[in-house]
């Protein structure tokens, strides 16, 4: 599948070392003014070569819009766009053309399709996420009038995490003040040391991205097979290297009792309701409660490392491999804007669905 979404849809195309990558957004309402500077800012956050902790690959990521815009506004037609690949070194992968790299999609792509693009991972490369960031920036602008806020950040690298007692709602400025997008200064320094150590040892390290969404109205999401947290989970787990997802207190709920886990409610003075906790992460029955939506995404270590590893080639022979190429020692810092982009895409889809299915008689307001 190369398409995500039902009403607000994104289809992506392109490979890591192909001529270009790109996408088509379908379902975006007409009349939305698209601010190109907003798109450029989001792309800059994801772009490689930003710091000592990211891949040295240099890409300008200039977006060319081909259709769907007229004088800066959406027309209701499909919005097609492309980003040229400029800084490719396909020769780095010549020696790997018949080798299955451990932890990559080489083996599975080859056995599924009988052919694979061996240059930089081809279609399975995280280079494709630049397209998601563009589309996410459009979705973000669509939802801007609603005042929804979404902030993702690095909460853990390797064994180092932000202490639970320090966790709070962070601002985008706090997140971006850290080279690895960890808004807790003390934890950020320790995490940077973990990445640095792994890099010096020709190794890599994984981590966790936390995301908080505020001011989503009550009622977004559908029962059963269209649950909002299921859509968010599918979106997050489609990101390269994502291996785990939990919403609210997630797996910790398994060790609680119902008396602890239930988010109890009380009547508010303004006639609405207030929740006494938010263990469910702002979603109940697959539908938003009006509370902050909280979730976490776990990312595995970058599979390409300089240490010698055992693998096989297409002929079925056992060999040893020390990987080459330009790669991040940790994908987490650059995954933060991708998590936000996929969140905006999911919310835009839920927003369009909510406009056709909302009950006109609901008068209870949630006060968080």
Swiss-Prot record:
Q: Could you state one GO biological process linked to this protein?
A: chorismate biosynthetic process
Q: What does this protein do?
A: This reaction introduces a second double bond into the aromatic ring system.
Family membership, please give it.
Belongs to the chorismate synthase family.
Molecular functions per Gene Ontology: chorismate synthase activity; FMN binding
What's an example GO cellular component term for this entry? cytosol
Q: Give binding positions for NADP(+).
A: 46
- What Enzyme Commission number(s) appear in the record? 4.2.3.5
Does Glycosyltransferase count among this protein's keywords?
no
Write out the catalysed reaction: 5-O-(1-carboxyvinyl)-3-phosphoshikimate = chorismate + phosphate
Q: Which Pfam families match?
A: Chorismate_synt
InterPro entries for this protein: Chorismate_synth (IPR000453), Chorismate_synth_AroC_sf (IPR035904), Chorismate_synthase_CS (IPR020541)
Outline the subunit composition: Homotetramer.
Question: Could you name the domain of life of the organism this protein comes from?
Answer: Bacteria
PANTHER family, per the entry? CHORISMATE SYNTHASE (PTHR21085:SF0)
Q: How is the cofactor bound?
A: Reduced FMN (FMNH(2)).
> What keywords tag this UniProt record?
Amino-acid biosynthesis, Aromatic amino acid biosynthesis, FAD, Flavoprotein, FMN, Lyase, NADP
Pathway the protein contributes to? Metabolic intermediate biosynthesis; chorismate biosynthesis; chorismate from D-erythrose 4-phosphate and phosphoenolpyruvate: step 7/7
Q: Which residues bind FMN?
A: 123-125, 240-241, 285, 300-304, 326
Q: Which residues form the signal peptide?
A: none
The record, for SUPFAM superfamilies, names: Chorismate synthase, AroC
Taxonomy, top ranks, is: Bacteria, Pseudomonadati, Bacteroidota, Bacteroidia, Bacteroidales
Q: What is this protein called?
A: Chorismate synthase
Say if the entry is tagged with keyword Cell membrane. Answer: no
Q: Which cofactor does it need?
A: FMNH2
């Amino acid at each position: 599948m190369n398409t995500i979404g039902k009403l607000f849809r994104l289809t992506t195309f392109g490979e890591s070392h192909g001529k270009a990558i790109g996408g088509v957004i379908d379902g975006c309402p007409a009349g939305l003014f698209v601010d190109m500077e907003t798109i450029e800012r989001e792309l800059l956050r994801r772009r490689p070569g930003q710091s000592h902790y990211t891949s040295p690959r240099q890409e300008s990521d200039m977006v060319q819009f081909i259709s769907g815009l007229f004088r800066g506004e959406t027309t209701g037609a499909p919005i097609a766009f492309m980003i040229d690949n400029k800084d490719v070194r396909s020769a780095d992968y010549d020696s790997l053309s018949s080798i299955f790299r451990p932890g990559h999609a080489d083996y599975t792509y080859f056995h599924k399709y009988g052919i694979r693009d061996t240059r930089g991972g081809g279609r399975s490369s995280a280079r494709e996420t630049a397209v998601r960031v563009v589309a996410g920036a459009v979705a973000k602008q669509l939802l801007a009038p609603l005042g929804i806020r979404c902030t993702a950040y690095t909460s853990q690298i390797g064994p180092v995490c932000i202490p639970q007692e320090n966790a709070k709602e962070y601002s985008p400025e706090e997140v971006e003040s850290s080279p690895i997008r960890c808004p807790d200064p003390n934890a950020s320094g320790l995490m940077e040391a973990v990445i640095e150590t792994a890099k010096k040892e020709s190794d890599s390290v994984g981590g966790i991205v936390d995301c908080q969404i505020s001011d989503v109205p009550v009622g977004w999401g559908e029962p059963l097979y269209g649950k909002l947290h299921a859509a968010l989970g599918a979106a997050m787990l489609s990101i390269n290297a994502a291996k785990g997802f939990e919403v609210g207190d997630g797996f910790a709920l398994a060790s609680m009792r119902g008396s602890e886990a239930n988010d109890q409610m009380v009547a508010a003075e303004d006639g609405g309701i207030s929740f006494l906790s938010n263990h469910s992460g702002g979603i109940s029955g697959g539908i938003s409660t009006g509370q902050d939506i909280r979730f976490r995404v776990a990312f595995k270590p970058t599979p390409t490392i300089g240490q010698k590893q055992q693998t096989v080639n297409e002929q079925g022979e056992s060999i040893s491999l020390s990987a080459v190429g330009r790669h991040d020692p940790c994908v987490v810092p650059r995954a933060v804007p991708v998590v936000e982009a996929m969140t905006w895409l999911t919310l835009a889809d839920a927003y369009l669905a909510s406009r056709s299915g909302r009950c006109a008689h609901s008068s209870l307001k949630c006060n968080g």
